Amino acid sequence: MPIRVPDELPAVNFLREENVFVMTTSRASGQEIRPLKVLILNLMPKKIETENQFLRLLSNSPLQVDIQLLRIDSRESRNTPAEHLNNFYCNFEDIQEQNFDGLIVTGAPLGLVEFNDVAYWPQIKQVLEWSKDHVTSTLFVCWAVQAALNILYGIPKQTRTDKLSGVYEHHILHPHALLTRGFDDSFLAPHSRYADFPAALIRDYTDLEILAETEEGDAYLFASKDKRIAFVTGHPEYDAQTLAQEYFRDVEAGLDPEVPYNYFPHNDPQNKPRASWRSHGNLLFTNWLNYYVYQITPYDLRHMNPTLD
């Protein structure tokens, strides 16, 4: 799926170097196709890096995807140039009257922060409430999963004593579910979080269907039966080096972090890690776009009536 982005977005050249099909707005305007409109609420500090990661996964199908980047934190960023934010991001007020086929809410490094202490917690709640009537399907990632479970289902914040960091094995629970179609019975995916997602807790509080779990019984992938919301508690979008960058950052900060599990060859941080989750990440996002967005979204977005057959 060629992603449609502004011509000047840094991700264009970055992804083209990887032979990822990126269609600029100027080229896409010549095609008589109604693109899928996907809004990305990017909560990560290094926004350009996160853009590259998600756009890579959204690019692998024959339809156009029109990407809109959203920010809700008005504070000055220490990790992303203000010019980039001003040029490529919109504020909620700019899009609140629009409808979208899909919404992705990224993770954020807020695992040890109480919800009410998050600077933009009211804005998160506002976006989630708005999405019920303006978005066909929403995908929450990592910390955003914890936030959404609290806002939508009242699940209290669950925090691990130690950070979960590494590449973990998971197994699917429903092999014929659309979101896991084509998955191997067992697959690897990276995690980097303090948030805890016991599968039993999610079953107790919600009617969400858990589609994949970790070997330890944590929920990894789950969704509503109507396909309107989906949750992934790990980071299938991560680059091969992302966990390493986080590890060495914490080492330099004197935090004495654990070496990420099952990540560095021979468990030696001096060895170059390899991504063992790329096929899983690509398939997950392709399935979400196809079965949870494209198959049920209305052709005319002015009328939000997803087909939930």
UniProtKB/Swiss-Prot annotation:
The record marks S192 as: Important for substrate specificity. The keyword Protease does not apply. It comes from the Bacteria. It is found in: Cytoplasm. One of its GO terms (molecular function) is homoserine O-succinyltransferase activity. Belongs to the MetA family. This is Homoserine O-succinyltransferase. It comes from Escherichia coli O157:H7. The lineage of its organism: Bacteria, Pseudomonadati, Pseudomonadota, Gammaproteobacteria, Enterobacterales. The gene is metAS.
